[in-house]
């Protein structure tokens, strides 16, 4: 059984997937299809089922049944598509890829929004400004912007240089992921794997890989909502997420979404 699963996974992973190319959902686009066939169509994580027709579903308040095109072959498919956004195979393939990529960046972004406040509060790392939406403005100060508050690490004084360097780094990673360069990817532009994208071999086992996909998409969705919450907090309270959390814990009645929503006025 194990050899059958690994063979099926290998055949599926090597095949090129058309996530952003507009080619629709080809037969090779989902490694899970072949894996599920080798395991009688059931891949379970704990006591729950996340794939196939018997998976956990959430239809929402306006859907009577799961659409036929949402058959549970992809991670994070709860059968909910009231607006029919996934009815077109090409749009579905593109939107699914965009969701995964945005979820990954949101997870990194959410960590970056909280981590400086944590370091300054509990580790003792001194930042000129630990709050995420205020930190960038430090580059315009006389001393410039220091990475981790240490001028001996990365000292930035040019906003154009910072933007250019960020575009270069993100572009290289995305280019490697999409093009599948030798030694970088395995031909799958959404889950490239290989020594650079999976150096610990976490996805070597196909069943574990299927579970990790579910965990990734669920945490990615949560991170995207978290980032949206951070944006709203920044506009309404002018404070970072950690400070807002402690304010709420200190006085939940005076510091909550309802109170701020009823008192908020733009520009105040």
UniProtKB/Swiss-Prot annotation:
Residue sites binding chlorophyll a 4 per the record: 219
Chain residues that bind chlorophyll b 4: 166, 177
Lipid bilayer topology: Multi-pass membrane protein
Molecular function (Gene Ontology), one example: chlorophyll binding
Residues that span the membrane, as ranges: 105-125, 153-173, 222-242
Subcellular location: Plastid, Chloroplast thylakoid membrane
Sites where the protein binds chlorophyll a 5: 215, 233
BP GO annotations: photosynthesis, light harvesting
Residues that hold chlorophyll a 1 according to the record: 80, 86, 99, 221
Chain residues that bind chlorophyll b 1: 58
Pfam families noted in UniProt: Chloroa_b-bind (PF00504)
Post-translational modification: Photoregulated by reversible phosphorylation of its threonine residues.
Binding residue positions for chlorophyll b 2: 104, 154
Record: residues binding chlorophyll a 3: 138, 148, 216
Keywords annotated in UniProt: Chlorophyll, Chloroplast, Chromophore, Magnesium, Membrane, Metal-binding, Phosphoprotein, Photosynthesis, Photosystem I, Photosystem II, Plastid, Thylakoid, Transit peptide, Transmembrane, Transmembrane helix
Record text about domains: The N-terminus of the protein extends into the stroma where it is involved with adhesion of granal membranes and post-translational modifications; both are believed to mediate the distribution of excitation energy between photosystems I and II.
Purpose of the protein: The light-harvesting complex (LHC) functions as a light receptor, it captures and delivers excitation energy to photosystems with which it is closely associated.
Name of the protein described by the UniProt record: Chlorophyll a-b binding protein of LHCII type III, chloroplastic
Source organism of this protein record: Hordeum vulgare
């Amino acid at each position: 059984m194990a050899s059958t699963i690994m063979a099926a996974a290998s055949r599926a992973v090597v095949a090129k997937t058309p996530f952003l190319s507009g080619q629709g959902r080809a037969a090779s686009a989902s490694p899970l299809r072949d894996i599920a066939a080798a395991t009688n169509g059931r891949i379970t994580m704990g006591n729950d089922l996340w794939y196939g027709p018997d998976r956990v579903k959430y239809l929402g308040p306006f859907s009577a049944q799961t659409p036929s095109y949402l058959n549970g072959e992809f991670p994070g498919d709860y059968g909910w598509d009231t607006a029919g956004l996934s009815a077109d195979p090409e749009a579905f393939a593109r939107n699914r890829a965009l969701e995964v990529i945005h979820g990954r960046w949101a997870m990194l972004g959410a960590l970056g929004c909280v981590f400086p406040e944590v370091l300054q509060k509990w580790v003792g790392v001194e930042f000129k400004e630990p709050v995420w939406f205020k930190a960038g403005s430090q580059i315009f100060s006389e001393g410039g912007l220091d990475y981790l508050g240490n001028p001996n690490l990365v000292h930035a004084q040019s906003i154009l240089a910072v933007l250019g360097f960020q575009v270069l780094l993100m572009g290289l990673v995305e280019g490697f992921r999409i093009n599948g360069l030798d030694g970088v990817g395995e031909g799958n532009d959404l889950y490239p794997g290989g020594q650079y994208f999976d150096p610990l071999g976490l996805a070597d086992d196909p069943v574990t890989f299927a579970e990790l996909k579910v965990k990734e998409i669920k945490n990615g969705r949560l991170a995207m909502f978290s980032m949206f919450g951070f944006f709203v907090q920044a506009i309404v309270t002018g404070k970072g997420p950690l400070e807002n959390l402690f304010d709420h814990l200190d006085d939940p009645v005076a510091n909550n979404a309802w109170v701020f929503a009823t008192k908020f006025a733009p520009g105040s």
